[in-house]
């Protein structure tokens, strides 16, 4: 199972992508618990804000898009963990899974 975090926007408008293969993580069960506890169905669309980041978080079968100001609590914890264990790569806008 993979977790993908794509961050777009900001002043430079870059798209950065971090990916983690949970099966390769020594604390896989902790990751799964965090992911299973996320309020995937409660994320609401908000108007875009200039020069702010937007995060697209995917872990099949789930996907959520959050504005920077929505990235709190367990969402922030997940994004921080993904960024700690994965190096970012640049991707073409609209194509975060392209390698």
Predicted regions: what is each one?
Residues 1-99:
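Function-determining sites in protein domains
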